[in-house]
């Protein structure tokens, strides 16, 4: 009886280890799907494979990433622009949780389609922080973002997770 009880406890412990391991792996994948891939390489621009939907009135496009630098000096984003893009503005922000680290408005007229849009940042003390790149507008802009769908990362449009990453890079030291 005592031996049988030990065997049962051993089996229960083994099953518990397997279940906990599975839950841990599943939660990591689920976290990645909701928040983007924590290992997303933001030190280089990704090659675009598609274009996002247009950034219009009230649209909020977000990409989560872990900052590899203590100081972010520059942010580079590749936009796509329609022929009828107007003179409206787009807001580019970096958030640390809900706290804004950086925010700048850019005139759509100053953006060249499918070229690097360089934005000076100068924010410090960010190495290892989970940041969110947020791109939004209060008006219809005629702008979209270049997207690399061949990554395991996810970006969000108005809270909906979509496979891929915005074609952007962060430079600093």
Segments and roles (model prediction):
Residues 2-99, 109-130, 136-173:
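Beta-sheet-rich sandwich/jelly-roll-like modules and their strand-loop junctions
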Residues 104-106:
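Short hydrophobic alpha-helix segments
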């Amino acid at each position: 009886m005592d031996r049988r009880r030990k065997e049962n406890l051993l089996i229960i412990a083994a099953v518990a280890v397997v279940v906990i391991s599975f839950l841990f792996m599943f939660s990591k994948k689920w976290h990645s799907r909701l928040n983007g891939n924590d290992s997303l390489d933001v030190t280089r621009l990704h090659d675009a494979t598609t274009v996002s939907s247009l950034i219009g009135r009230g649209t909020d496009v977000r990409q989560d990433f872990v900052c590899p630098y203590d100081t972010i000096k520059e942010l580079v984003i590749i936009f796509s622009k329609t022929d009828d893009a107007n003179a409206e503005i787009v807001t580019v922000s970096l958030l640390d949780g809900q706290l804004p680290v950086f925010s700048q408005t850019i005139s759509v007229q100053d953006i060249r389609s499918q070229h690097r849009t360089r934005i000076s940042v100068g924010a410090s003390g960010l190495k290892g922080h989970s940041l969110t790149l947020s791109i939004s507008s209060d008006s219809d802009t005629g702008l979209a973002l270049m997207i690399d769908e061949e990554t395991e990362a996810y970006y969000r449009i108005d809270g909906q997770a979509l496979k891929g990453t915005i074609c952007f890079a962060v430079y600093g030291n």
